[in-house]
Amino acid sequence: MQALILAAGTGKRLCEYTQNNTKCMVPVNGVKLIDRMLSQLLKLKLNRVVIVIGYKGQELMDYLGDNYHGLSIKYVNNPIYDKTNNIYSLALAKDELQEDDTLLVESDLIFDDGMFKLLLDNSFPNLALVAKYETWMDGTMVCIDEDDNIVNFVPKAAFDYNDVGKYYKTVNIYKFSKDFAHNKYVPFLEAYSKAVGNNEYYENVLRIITFLNNHDLKALPITNEKWYEIDDKQDLDIAEAVFAEDKDIINKYYGRYGGFWRFPQMLDYCYLVNPYFSSSKLLDEMQANFKTLLTEYPSGMKVNSLLASKCWGIRQEYIVPGNGAAELIKCLMELDNGKIGIIRPTFEEYPNRLEKDFVVPFVPKFRL
């Protein structure tokens, strides 16, 4: 068994983080992606690792050398990385791909230590790790049947929000047998590149193979394993929260001040949300008028106070619309001069309105 890592891309969306290095050299919580990945591969007793390099490839080679703590590394260079996509990078490594059973992985991933082992412990020779669709996911999706056969690859251009209940996201970690690579994948890869071009994705080849015979490649759905694909600065920020050490994780989330829908496994007890609002009828009305609400300019405060007066039967002159609960919390906290107990996690507007000596915190045992 060998591993093949695709690491040729420029990572432009990471801006200053990739100005002088390739994406896999970007640190997450102080550890470079490539160091984390190779450390995980070290535990598998592989024959070697093949890395396809391109942008800042020499810097990566200088950093890693040809041996990583006893793990042999072979490099394949993509000299036109700025004009091609990962299908070309993989095509350059087609000979290496056919020499051994292979774990194929993209270099901009961060994931739990057990992910590779999931593939190796499964007896099926050709597998794609997939995760049930969540709102933060982007890129290629798949649909699978009851036997975990991949029946369709859904490219980004064909994504349909009406079908998200059927979608699984490819984690971009695969296991290919030597036989599959030699007899199926590489022949189709060569034909596809010749017919369509080199500025494509290697998963498009898998899409064709599964269309012709969906029993060659199975999906392996993950459950609670953590992973993230780092394409831009926001991805990096989220990944640093998801993969923070236990001692840092609370502060990583506190510092976000909301937006916790990006972490679907988290229950938010900090911020002011109302499970009874909006009503189903109001949601339906908003959805029906979404385009108007999004594109038209809203009314001013005078009209808002009039509408509130109509809804609640209060004289308009007694109503002052505010910009959220934070304005009311400021007034509330100024009414009490004593110490106030705060259970954490909490809505930080409460303790932020008090001097430190007037806050009595209670922090229960916390674990994600």
Language model feature labels by segment:
Residues 1-3, 167-255, 261-265:
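Conserved alpha/beta core of the MobA/IspD/sugar-nucleotide pyrophosphorylase nucleotidyltransferase superfamily
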Residues 1-5, 31-100:
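Conserved N-terminal catalytic core of the sugar/cofactor nucleotidyltransferase
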Residues 1-18:
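N-terminal nucleotide-binding beta1-loop-alpha1 segment
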Residues 6, 105, 269:
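Catalytic metal- and UDP-sugar-binding loop of GT-A-like glycosyltransferases, i.e.
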Residues 68-140, 146:
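Conserved beta-loop-beta/alpha segment of the NTase-like Rossmann-fold superfamily
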Residues 112-196:
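Conserved core of the sugar-phosphate nucleotidyltransferase
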Residues 244-296, 368:
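N-terminal "arm"/small-domain region of PLP-dependent enzymes with the aminotransferase-like
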Residues 294-368:
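Conserved core of the PLP fold type I
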